[in-house]
Amino acid sequence: MASPDRSKRKILKAKKTMPLSCRKQVEMLNKSRNVEALKTAIGSNVPSGNQSFSPSVITRTTEITKCSPSENGASSLDSNKNSISEKSKVFSQNCIKPVEEIVHSETKLEQVVCSYQKPSRTTESPSRVFTEEAKDSLNTSENDSEHQTNVTRSLFEHEGACSLKSSCCPPSVLSGVVQMPESTVTSTVGDKKTDQMVFHLETNSNSESHDKRQSDNILCSEDSGFVPVEKTPNLVNSVTSNNCADDILKTDECSRTSISNCESADSTWQSSLDTNNNSHYQKKRMFSENEENVKRMKTSEQINENICVSLERQTAFLEQVRHLIQQEIYSINYELFDKKLKELNQRIGKTECRNKHEGIADKLLAKIAKLQRRIKTVLLFQRNCLKPNMLSSNGASKVANSEAMILDKNLESVNSPIEKSSVNYEPSNPSEKGSKKINLSSDQNKSVSESNNDDVMLISVESPNLTTPITSNPTDTRKITSGNSSNSPNAEVMAVQKKLDSIIDLTKEGLSNCNTESPVSPLESHSKAASNSKETTPLAQNAVQVPESFEHLPPLPEPPAPLPELVDKTRDTLPPQKPELKVKRVFRPNGIALTWNITKINPKCAPVESYHLFLCHENSNNKLIWKKIGEIKALPLPMACTLSQFLASNRYYFTVQSKDIFGRYGPFCDIKSIPGFSENLT
């Protein structure tokens, strides 16, 4: 039986929808069970050795239902029809002979019985009935062998039972009244279908003896089919004859032998049927197995096709992934190449810039060397020109010596009162360096030379009567003028002997109320110049040497705190040092000169960025307040500046504070004071 699906097997149920093979198997099992039940019943009903037994009723019913070959069973029976028909023919010929013998024996009894009956009633001999029925069964066996074998089996069982009864009965019973059964066989055969065949045999024997004994009633009934046939009473005839007993015994023996032969033939036929059925079932199983194998092959082919399709999909997907990976690798390689190329270009640019910078540095160094050569030539020219005129006048040399002493003492540039010249200088850029060179000619004409260095200024004066004003314009250009005097050539020697080669004035432009001015006033005589120089020296000494107390002054302003971002950078450096301040008053022009310096510079201190100037002045109307009057960018020490604009006050107080490049402020210097002006200086 082929299963529809290997994964899901259906549960077999006895329903109308059951397949034909299953139905046939169920029918065969039911038939085999019925045969076994009949055999057990026969074995239990046979007496074991008792010659006399009580009246008993034995009933055997064999139901055989043979339907005509229907549409559902036709396919299963066609395969075995030929083999079964041949065996049934042979079997039927073997069975007909004992049946005829039994029938002839019974006809003899019938003749004996019928001799005592009335001539009007004629009974049909049972031999003819049985032979006709056997022939009918043989005719129907061609259509269905199983039906014929069951019919003959029922006849054999019936005769066997009768023979057993007759053998067990004593002769006294046989000498009595014997009632022979009338067998009625009903066979219905359709034109094309044989629905049912029923053989009903009934035997009622009642023997009554003249000695008032009860007779044994023996009933043997064979039922074949689903519908039982009603029992019909037969004619009972009383026969008293002793001659018939021997014939009955002989017929019983013959019936026994025929029954045994039939049983042996039946067993052989049953075995042949079993083998045929087994072969049929084996063929069916082989057919179902073949179908299952075909289905399995189909399913395996489908599975293989599905596997091939899935493999193709996987390979296509892997190809796509491989292509994407290659594209990604190419893009990464391109990016790396671009990055390396960019770095290479940057390096090439740096090398080119280095070459450019080296060229620029070479040019700058060449310019510096050129300037140095020019400065040296100017200095040599001045020395060579001024040496012959150094000893021309003693008075001029005295004035020069006095002015040199003042410059050495105060460390600042002071204009000589003899010359009545004032010099004011304002640096705009600490990084720029310049030098002013003055070339003197033999005919005492004015000559001015300028260079790119603005931090160094060289001044030479030809005559004490000359004034050399230096004014600063917004473009930070310095001009040095030298004029000729009309008095005497001795004044030139006196001016050269002073050696005022370098005078620096660092007054910053833009200080609060401080403007640099350079008035020009001619001097008439040497006596006035000498007296003025004598007056300025004690004033400067008094301003420096007089100690004063500044308790009445307000406290100095507190510097702002440094930025927190610069704390880490300033760990290894110290704040700026405390400077030393000096104050001096000048008259022409009227003003105050400030100078400051640091004697011992600590290398651990950070570089100074700028210096801050503070002023406090006494006034009856105003309070004492410290004011920041200016901020000067740091230059190499010592430094100086000149203040020319003041408000009227009794006394002025000055202090200086330095600031480094990190924004830290150093301590204030010692406060210095100087007498004030009665009038406002503008």
From Swiss-Prot:
Residues 137-148, 418-451, 462-490, 528-538 have a biased composition (Polar residues). It comes from the Eukaryota. Pfam families: ATF7IP_BD (PF16788), fn3_4 (PF16794). The modification Phosphoserine is found at residues 416, 488, 521. It is found in: Nucleus. GO terms for molecular function: transcription coregulator activity. Residues 575-680 form the Fibronectin type-III domain. One of its GO terms (cellular component) is nucleus. GO terms for biological process: regulation of DNA-templated transcription. Keywords: Activator, Coiled coil, Nucleus, Phosphoprotein, Repeat, Repressor, Transcription, Transcription regulation. Residues 120-148, 418-491, 513-538 are annotated as: Disordered. The keyword Repeat applies. Residues 328-378 form a coiled coil. Interacts with MBD1, SETDB1 and SP1. Probably forms a complex with SETDB1 and MBD1. Belongs to the MCAF family. Recruiter that couples transcriptional factors to general transcription apparatus and thereby modulates transcription regulation and chromatin formation. Can both act as an activator or a repressor depending on the context. Mediates MBD1-dependent transcriptional repression, probably by recruiting complexes containing SETDB1. The complex formed with MBD1 and SETDB1 represses transcription and probably couples DNA methylation and histone H3 'Lys-9' trimethylation (H3K9me3) activity. This is Activating transcription factor 7-interacting protein 2. It comes from Homo sapiens (Human).
